[in-house]
């Protein structure tokens, strides 16, 4: 193992132990940093002390030429900057060579959501098969509380307060949130808990795979996509789309941006504000369809 690999392994241990980042986030860091290790090795670097701003810029250009999108490149450079900042804090680098290198701005795409009618159709799973009950409970919790995928799979039974209809989740940066989940989610969690012991697990996880282990993020993605097809939805159903739908529907009903920010666990209001654009699109379509002066130029 080269010094390049050794330093990255040390950094990943730091993120896991000191920062307590989720396994999914750690895997993302690992993938991004493996790309720079490969590039550095190809260019004859033996240690990170040999890396300079020119090499980082060349790495960014190479990534773009290989088809990496602007948003993905920004993520890769962010991981690299964080890694170099850590090396500086360990007195192994004098300065961060990635500090002044930025990716081109990515066009901001509005997140797609599932409308209320399609959401009701998706949630209309009335099968008494244990795995179907588990899936219905996961869908209800994710849409009912606007959880991230990592937050959903990280739920333990001890995080539930079904009497008050609340759940505790550990979000980004180890920030805990206490969230209402709604009576439908409570009812389906209770139904799932009645069947959960069939899997004979001693795991504390709320949601289990058919092998009795904590369900994986990939398994959740696969099951949600399958239910989208079974329930006749035209659009691909993935977990983050349920979170988008929660945010959009909450804003359409309440208009309370700050409240939705708290529920989603966004550190910055600007992250939540993207959903106001979605809400405006909805209002604009209503206006165009209903207002007598809307049909301009016709």
Swiss-Prot record:
Query: What does UniProt list under activity regulation?
Result: During recombination, the heterotetrameric complex catalyzes two consecutive pairs of strand exchanges, implying that specific pairs of active sites are sequentially switched on and off in the recombinase tetramer to ensure that appropriate DNA strands will be exchanged at both reaction steps. FtsK plays a central role in this catalytic state switch that turns recombinase on and off reciprocally. The reciprocal C-terminal interaction between XerC and XerD may also participate in the enzymatic switch process.
- Principal cellular location given in the protein's record: cytoplasm
Q: Which domain of life does the protein's organism represent?
A: Bacteria
Q: What PROSITE patterns does the database record attribute to this sequence?
A: CB (PS51900), TYR_RECOMBINASE (PS51898)
Q: Which UniProt keywords apply?
A: Cell cycle, Cell division, Chromosome partition, Cytoplasm, DNA integration, DNA recombination, DNA-binding
Extract one GO molecular function annotation from the record.
tyrosine-based site-specific recombinase activity
Q: Which positions are catalytic residues? A: 148, 172, 240, 243, 266, 275
Tell me a GO cellular component: Holliday junction resolvase complex
For this protein, the record's Gene3D superfamilies field holds:
1.10.150.130, Intergrase catalytic core
Q: Please explain the role this protein plays, according to its UniProt record.
A: Site-specific tyrosine recombinase, which acts by catalyzing the cutting and rejoining of the recombining DNA molecules. Binds cooperatively to specific DNA consensus sequences that are separated from XerD binding sites by a short central region, forming the heterotetrameric XerC-XerD complex that recombines DNA substrates. The complex is essential to convert dimers of the bacterial chromosome into monomers to permit their segregation at cell division. It also contributes to the segregational stability of plasmids at ColE1 xer (or cer) and pSC101 (or psi) sites.
Q: How does it assemble?
A: Forms a cyclic heterotetrameric complex composed of two molecules of XerC and two molecules of XerD, in which XerC interacts with XerD via its C-terminal region, XerD interacts with XerC via its C-terminal region and so on.
Q: Which family does it belong to?
A: Belongs to the 'phage' integrase family. XerC subfamily.
Show the NCBIfam families listed in the entry. PRK00283.1, recomb_XerC
Q: What is this protein called?
A: Tyrosine recombinase XerC
Q: Which organism is it from?
A: Escherichia coli (strain K12)
Query: Gene name, please?
Result: xerC
């Amino acid at each position: 193992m080269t010094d390049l690999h050794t330093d990255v392994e040390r950094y990943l241990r730091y993120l896991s132990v000191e920062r307590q980042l989720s396994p999914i986030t750690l895997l993302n860091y690992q993938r991004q940093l493996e790309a720079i290790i490969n590039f550095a090795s190809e260019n004859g670097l033996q240690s990170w002390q040999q890396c300079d701003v020119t090499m980082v810029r060349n790495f960014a250009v190479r990534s773009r030429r290989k088809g990496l999108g602007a948003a993905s490149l920004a993520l890769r450079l962010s991981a690299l900057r964080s890694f170099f900042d850590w090396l500086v804090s360990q007195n192994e680098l004098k300065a961060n060579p990635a500090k002044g290198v930025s990716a081109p701005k990515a066009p901001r795409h509005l997140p797609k959501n599932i409308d209320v009618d399609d959401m009701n159709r998706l949630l209309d799973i009335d099968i008494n098969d244990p795995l179907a009950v588990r899936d219905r409970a996961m869908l209800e919790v994710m849409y009912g509380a606007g959880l991230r995928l990592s937050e959903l799979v990280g739920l333990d039974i001890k995080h539930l307060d079904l009497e008050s209809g609340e759940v505790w989740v550990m979000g980004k940066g180890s920030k805990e949130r206490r969230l209402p989940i709604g009576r439908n989610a409570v009812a389906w969690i209770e139904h799932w808990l009645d069947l959960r012991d069939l899997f004979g697990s001693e795991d504390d996880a709320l949601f289990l795979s058919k092998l009795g282990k904590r369900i994986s993020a990939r398994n959740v993605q696969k099951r949600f996509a399958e239910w989208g097809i079974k329930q006749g939805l035209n659009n691909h159903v993935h977990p983050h789309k349920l979170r988008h739908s929660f945010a959009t529907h909450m804003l359409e009903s309440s208009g309370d941006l700050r409240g939705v920010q708290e529920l989603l666990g966004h550190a910055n209001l600007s992250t939540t504000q993207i959903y106001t654009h979605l809400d405006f699109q909805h209002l604009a379509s209503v206006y165009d369809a209903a207002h007598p002066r809307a049909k301009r130029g016709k």
